[in-house]
Each structure stands twice: as structure tokens, then as C-alpha cells.
Amino acid sequence: MSPRRRLTFIGGALLVSIVMPFAALLAADVFLHTRFQRTGGVNIWGYRGPIVHRKQPGEHRVVMLGGSSAFGYGVTWQEAIPSQLESKIRSRGERVSVVNLAYNNEGAYSFRFTLDDYLYLDYDLAILYEGYNDLMGDPRAPNFSVVRHESPVFRATGYLPIFPLVFREKAASMLYRGDIGQMYDEMRTGRKVVFDASLADRAKAGALNASAAVGDAIQRQLGRMSPEPRPSIASPNASGCPHPWAEYCQSVLTAVEFGLQHGKRLLVVTQPYLVGQSGVRHQDQQQAMVSALRRRFGAEQRLAYFDAGAIVDLSDPALSFDRMHLTAPGNERIASALAGPVRDLLAR
């Protein structure tokens, strides 16, 4: 074999050894997206529900941001608030699409990044729907979760690999008796959850987590080429909110400013009030946030606020299965309540 042919052969072999594993990994990831996006997953572009295409003439597009309550944890994508809201508005003969950009564990800090990531959807109005995931109110450890940005592939291309998350959530389901929310609580608070899974389930979960770690390792290698800036909230005290809500308020204000600067309308929504002492804290948080909005933006016509705090009684098991996340009927109530404010804001 001539030196030239030998080099060609070596180059081809190296190319195959690199391309083939990535192609196989991509094919497996696309399969997992297809399998899980209709239940508890997301599509290849990182949002829940069907992929939306170029906005049509006369169509209004709405996006909904938030954490697991907006995402629709525990229900199908059709039963989540965004899909039901779309159906409510369309039933009046209006052309509208509502895209679910929420993600489990995310709080107000993520809003600005998500609004930016999905500008290409050409949305007209953004609904900001999250307070629960910022109730810790600890300025030393705010909720900096921006789940999609943990993937260098998403940051570079907009494609969100799902297989590490699917494997990790499957493992968590085995360890936490089917309650993957405990995994996210542990990630958010740092408090370890004691579980009593069987040895067999622990072994299976360990294997799944090991597989997820392989995917994470590949992404970390890619991440070295496009490192993510260290998360921070600039000048939280500028929000004017009292302790411990300054970081939360500033994150909401930052998102609203970003949206207005890009010609978007924004609807900020208070979620159903939590029960007991958590509810008292939730109401205090929301009152501080609303006051900050009014101080900063006054009578801005492209911004509206809606209080859905009393729309759903979270102690009613027919409407909420865990006193936080809603059942399909609970989500339907919120969607019905939001339809009017959304239509009014789109008409401005």
C-alpha cells in the first residue's frame, strides 16, 4: 500500500471511528425524544409538545415560561396549561399557537435566557409563570437553574439531547418511589433525600446514572469550546424588593425588560397560592414582585399582570395531586382564567 493510500485509509478509519458513535448516539437520542415527548419529555428543540413551524400570516404566537407547574408535571402535554390555553382561545375562532417553554426546576432567573433562546419562534406574547421555585429566597444560593444551558449542544445548535435526562429521571423514579420531583428538590436545595429502594432497583438506577454520565462527559468535552458564563444576578437590590425577594424580583424585572426591548408583550402571572405557611410566604413574595413591576414599568401597555392565586384550591385533590402541581382539570381552570387576559393583551 502506497504512503498516500495508507494515509487515506487511516484518515477514513479515524473519521468513521468518530462519526459513527456520534451518529448512533444522535439516532438513539432522536428515538428517545419521539418516545417520551408526548408524556413527560420534550421535543428535539427542547420544549414540550409538537414542534411549531414558521408563524403564519394572521397567527398570534404565545410562549409560556416557568417551572414544573407550567411544564405540566404529572400530566400529558395536552393536559398542561399551555395546550389547554391554546384550545380555549382557538375555540373562539382565533388563530393562535401557545408553546410550552417551561422546564422542571427552573425559576425566574431562567426567564431571560429562555426568552432569548426562543426568539426564533417569533412569539408575540410571553407568559411568565413561576414563583414556587424561588420561595427559598436565599440570596447566598438563588435558583440559577437554566436546564437547557447545561447542554453545550443546545447552546450551540438549539438541539437538546435528552438521553442523559431520561436515564437520570428513570433512575430517580426507581430510587424515589416514582417521585422524580424529589430529585429536582435535592438538586435545588442540596438536601439529600433518604430513600429505601431495593438493592435491585439501586443497581438498575446505578447503571442508568452511569450511562447518563457518559452522555454528560461527552457534552462537557464540547462545553470546553463554548463555556457558559458563571451565573449571577446583577444589582438585585435595584428591584426595591425587601429581603428575601430581591433576587427573585430582579430576575422578573430583567426578563420583562428583555421582552419589551424585543417588542414583545408580557403577562406576569401569580400561580395558585400554596397551602399553610408556604402560602403565606408565597403571597408575600408575589406582593413584593407586583410592587416592583409597578414601580419599574408603571402603565406600560405591553405589560399586564394576572393574579391566579385564588383560581385553584391546592388542597382539593381533584385539582392538585400534591398541593402544588395540578391535575388536568386544575390546569383547565388556569387556562380558562388566562384566556381573557391573553386575548386582551394580544389586542393591544
Predicted region positions:
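N-terminal secretory targeting modules
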Residues: 1-63, 75-76, 94, 109, ...
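Short, hydrophobic alpha-helical segments
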Residues: 31, 179, 191-193, 338-348
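Serine-esterase "nucleophile elbow" of acetyl-processing enzymes
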Residues: 45-104, 112-127, 331-332
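Extracytoplasmic/secreted envelope proteins and their assembly/folding machinery
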Residues: 78, 82, 86, 108, ...
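Residue-level recognition of beta-strand->loop/alpha-helix junctions
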Residues: 100-102, 270-271, 307-309
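Serine-dependent acyl-ester chemistry module
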Residues: 133-294, 313-317
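Histidine-centered active-site loop/cap adjacent to the catalytic His
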Residues: 248, 319-348
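Structural recognition of alpha->loop->beta junctions
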Residues: 288-306
